[in-house]
Amino acid sequence: MGKTQKKNSKGRLDRYYYLAKEKGYRARSSFKIIQINEKYGHFLEKSKVVIDLCAAPGSWCQVASKLCPVNSLIIGVDIVPMKPMPNVITFQSDITTEDCRSKLRGYMKTWKADTVLHDGAPNVGLGWVQDAFTQSQLTLQALKLAVENLVVNGTFVTKIFRSKDYNKLIWVFQQLFEKVEATKPPASRNVSAEIFVVCKGFKAPKRLDPRLLDPKEVFEELPDGQQNMESKIYNPEKKVRKRQGYEEGDNLLYHETSILDFVRTEDPISMLGEMNKFTIDENDHEWKILKKLKQTTDEFRSCIEDLKVLGKKDFKMILRWRKIAREILGIEVKDDAKTEIEVVPLTEEEQIEKDLQGLQEKQRLNVKRERRRKNEMKQKELQRMQMNMITPTDIGIEAASLGKESLFNLKTAEKTGILNDLAKGKKRMIFTDDELAKDNDIYIDENIMIKDKDSAADADDLESELNAMYSDYKTRRSERDAKFRAKQARGGDNEEEWTGFNEGSLEKKEEEGKDYIEDNDDEGVEGDSDDDEAITNLISKLKGQEGDHKLSSKARMIFNDPIFNNVEPDLPVNTVNDGIMSSESVGDISKLNKKRKHEEMHQKQDEADSSDESSSDDSDFEIVANDNASEEFDSDYDSEEEKNQTKKEKHSRDIDIATVEAMTLAHQLALGQKNKHDLVDEGFNRYTFRDTENLPDWFLEDEKEHSKINKPITKEAAMAIKEKIKAMNARPIKKVAEAKARKRMRAVARLEKIKKKAGLINDDSDKTEKDKAEEISRLMRKVTKKPKTKPKVTLVVASGRNKGLAGRPKGVKGKYKMVDGVMKNEQRALRRIAKKHHKKK
């Protein structure tokens, strides 16, 4: 006999069924509460008292006894008897009766439950609507028991069916709990209509409305509201289905009424939405009057014959006709009397308040307009910065952004009437013959002034033209030469280190270049001086910004020290050629540093002595030691080995031999071929005190390229630099190193992730050791799985025994390709043709 296949019982005999039998649970529903507990914060592990309503056969009680703390009180109740379970109190009772409530109080005594579970369902089979309503009633009874026995911030988990009463139950839950969420765990079958609601944070109200837990009040059918007929009239294209059925007693789908009833009704919209046709009685006296209207056209007659096919425009036409018909029949009287509006004059306080409000509104609009303008300027500035459009024209942009507060606002000066006063400064430069005759000291030769002015202007024009031509040349060269473009981006190879300037000398030079002309008019002088002061501040600000860009961090750190405040810039700035600094500047600076330290030490000792003598007289003053000096005194107590070690480390960090000339000099110093005095002597040359101030850029760059010292180099130095560069080039590029590092990081992260997963698998007590081993081995196979590599194609030369062979050659496995001399010549010809075309491009 053949085997009979057992029915699957609507999919209940799935993996959860067999897993429940393996774990020893009484039903597959135990995995539902396990998954809900894991999803919502492991509330069972924190529960000391648990009540399971409708608990048969007891699978949820088994899970609770396993997850809850030791010595927890777990009570299970159902209408059918259950087999006893360890650590669980079970009894038989109906949860809708008073007997169940009294037994629960007897077992719990003065305790309150932390969690109430409900997984009950009624006997089904009467019909879907009846079964869903009975389930909702049962859920409400379970909620009633939970409200009586739950502790504050307790948890309630229940099962409900998807039905029309679902939203009503959710509303009741939300009145009693802080957080209400509906979920469907994976263990619940998809074909089942059940869903689970998790209610957390029980509010425990002191006074509870009994209607909130009364099934008659909660599930009461509310009467439907009045049907919205306006949507039918003003949006007839959108059809709304009657999902709740048709009205009781309305057995017909076709309705008609008289057109005069439509005119007399107070709710024409509803009538238009309900009726299919308006009938006309030709013998009616009122219709004979309305028939003579010019609005009663043939189109109107055809529209009222079938109202269900009309559109929005047709319905509006019918409503306008009804309005005119009501006026003619006297049903609706048109109010032609115009209401007279009495204008009451404002009082003085009201007028002031109105004007104040107008000014405030005007000020608000001005502020809003100014804010919008500033935002637009910021957006344009950001766009220019993103497009690298940062050029010297930014000065003009900044000046334009000042708006009304700009430096030269001639419109404001013209409105205020002081434009002529502002021009008096230039008017005073023109002297009359009488003034020249009165004062013999004042004599101006106009011809000489014009001649000098023309020659200076020509020189300035020529210089600016040369600078513009040179900038155009650099732009063209950077477009076609990538190396030159990279050099410009780096800022040049031989960029000198800027050491700062003295503010006093700069102010002296600016004062020497200024010419002030006295003016008898005080207001004119004051206006001109303000303008000159603003321009001077702008120029000094721009120069300061340029200096900040050129000043290196090392020089800034040195010159910020207070001891350099009164030092004049009397040291020459030596140029740096090919990465080697002249020895004279190094020696002079080191000597000056030593001398300055000795002078500072003597000065501090003198100040200390003088302070002791004058302490009685000048007690208000206090001499604070410099931080740098304290560091020097602290360093005296260090050992010589630590000093030497720090000096060596600092020396090794600062010096880097990067050129052949520097390597040659290092070899000569190491071999004793040169000493300090030789380096000092070499520092004195014609390039040392070169004056490069106020020279154009094209001249300076040409001098850097051609006018420089050619120092002798050796073969050994060149080989050493070559080996150094070779070692640097042998290192992987930044992208390759970063890619390798990322690969290692991903591998480590993947391994850590697998370790965590393996730990979770080991900690899962619900799985057997065999399942754990299989899952861990599956994870390890994913990590150790090697990427698939394409099989190599074997090349077989079509010569000898393989010549003219139709099938697979002997001894060749996998993919293969037949090649011969003709194919080789063809490939060579193709490469030659491609190379030829590449040269033409």
Curated annotation (Swiss-Prot):
Positions carrying Phosphoserine: 455, 464, 529
Biased composition (Acidic residues): 518-534, 608-621, 629-641
GO cellular component terms given for this protein: nucleolus; nucleus; preribosome, large subunit precursor
The enzyme's E.C. designation: 2.1.1.167
Biased composition annotated in UniProt, kind: Basic and acidic residues: 505-517, 598-607, 642-654
Localization: Nucleus, Nucleolus
Residues the record lists as binding S-adenosyl-L-methionine: 58, 60, 78, 94, 119
Catalytically driven reaction(s): guanosine(2922) in 27S pre-rRNA + S-adenosyl-L-methionine = 2'-O-methylguanosine(2922) in 27S pre-rRNA + S-adenosyl-L-homocysteine + H(+)
Principal place of residence: nucleus
Swiss-Prot/TrEMBL keywords: Coiled coil, Methyltransferase, Nucleus, Phosphoprotein, Ribosome biogenesis, rRNA processing, S-adenosyl-L-methionine, Transferase
Coiled-coil blocks: 360-389
Region (Disordered): 480-534, 565-654
Polar residues bias spans: 574-585
Superkingdom in the source lineage: Eukaryota
Any one biological process term the GO annotation gives: maturation of 5.8S rRNA from tricistronic rRNA transcript (SSU-rRNA, 5.8S rRNA, LSU-rRNA)
GO molecular function terms noted in the UniProt entry: rRNA (guanine) methyltransferase activity; rRNA (guanosine-2'-O-)-methyltransferase activity; rRNA (uridine-2'-O-)-methyltransferase activity
PANTHER family: PRE-RRNA 2'-O-RIBOSE RNA METHYLTRANSFERASE FTSJ3, RIBOSOMAL RNA METHYLTRANSFERASE
Subunit structure: Component of the nucleolar and nucleoplasmic pre-60S ribosomal particle. Interacts with the snoRNA-associated proteins NOP1 and NOP58.
HAMAP family: RNA_methyltr_E (MF_01547), RNA_methyltr_E_SPB1 (MF_03163)
Role, per record: Required for proper assembly of pre-ribosomal particles during the biogenesis of the 60S ribosomal subunit. Specifically methylates the guanosine in position 2922 of the 25S rRNA at the stage of 27S pre-rRNA maturation. Also methylates the uridine in position 2921 in the absence of methylation of this residue guided by snoRNA snR52 at the stage of 35S pre-rRNA maturation.
Family per similarity comment: Belongs to the class I-like SAM-binding methyltransferase superfamily. RNA methyltransferase RlmE family. SPB1 subfamily.
The name this protein goes by in its record: 27S pre-rRNA (guanosine(2922)-2'-O)-methyltransferase
UniProt organism field: Saccharomyces cerevisiae (strain ATCC 204508 / S288c)
Gene: SPB1
